């Protein structure tokens, strides 16, 4: 029987297993202990707890192995930790940790801190990806290929230009992620179950002790609100959705019918019956898991949407989807960074296809217009020439000399890639 419900009675193993979050709480185990240390330390600071009692509790918290707390039959890790402290120190010492706290504000704090740790890991992986993209873009600045619209050969670009497009996505994501991260840096501690606590805690000092930058002022919203989780999940899921488009491109280009990329051997597998196959399995998994993240976000937002602003156990079920989204992103971005660092692009094939499939036609029409022919007339004349096999098109290298910021002009690609590489530490790529 769980510790808190022992006074109610009615032990039920089925119900205990069904409602307990103890297995999922592995994601926040260290943060729960950290939050408890801050709580006890502050109670001693304001004189609500004798220093010698607080010292014993903090010393015990320094010793506890958070993973051990996950092995018992408890509702959650908060209950397990309090029971462990009481068993170790006695009720006259351990029994004080329940003062001026609720599982509601403490779990909200632990989730925020654990999420921030994962966001840090994701940011590091994203920066590794950015550095890889910039380095390879510089290497392939002059390597032509057709771009694709409607999955048809379109305007000629370079592989370096394509990689910088992916990098710009990652840069935008990091900007959005930072805004969502700021929400998670606000502390709910001291909010209690909903309306605050009678013990005169200094919530700003408590936030400082726990490692937060600010506080969520309204106590009801602090303990029951989950907008920070929705914001993080939304930012990361949106990024994965957009990133999966590039992942899909790489998978297509690995097909020998296109043959634009040679995937690193460690990223491919073969068939059990067709030994010629080189299946880009890492990116296939990343593509699938990006779609899974969409499902997790739908589940997270769906659960939160049906719960009043105060805490309900529904929110316990929502949190696991946040961890799934963040874990999918961290692992996936690390895999993609490794892929980009090692990929080889077939510049000869890219140039040949750009020439074969008229990827310089728009530049040719535009060039004629700049020489005095109305653009639509130049367009139709060129269309007729292409249909008749008589078109005199700009060469690939001529077409790439577009004088606009951010274009596929190799000089523009080199400047942009060099500027972005300057943000990278040498060990990052």
Swiss-Prot record:
The lineage of its organism: Archaea, Thermoproteota, Thermoprotei, Thermoproteales, Thermoproteaceae. It is an enzyme of class 4 (lyase). Its EC number is 4.3.2.1. The keyword Hydrolase does not apply. GO terms for cellular component: cytosol. Transmembrane segments: none annotated. This is Argininosuccinate lyase. Pathway: Amino-acid biosynthesis; L-arginine biosynthesis; L-arginine from L-ornithine and carbamoyl phosphate: step 3/3. Coiled coil: none annotated. It comes from the Archaea. One of its GO terms (biological process) is arginine biosynthetic process via ornithine. The keyword Cytoplasm applies. It catalyses: 2-(N(omega)-L-arginino)succinate = fumarate + L-arginine. Keywords: Amino-acid biosynthesis, Arginine biosynthesis, Cytoplasm, Lyase.
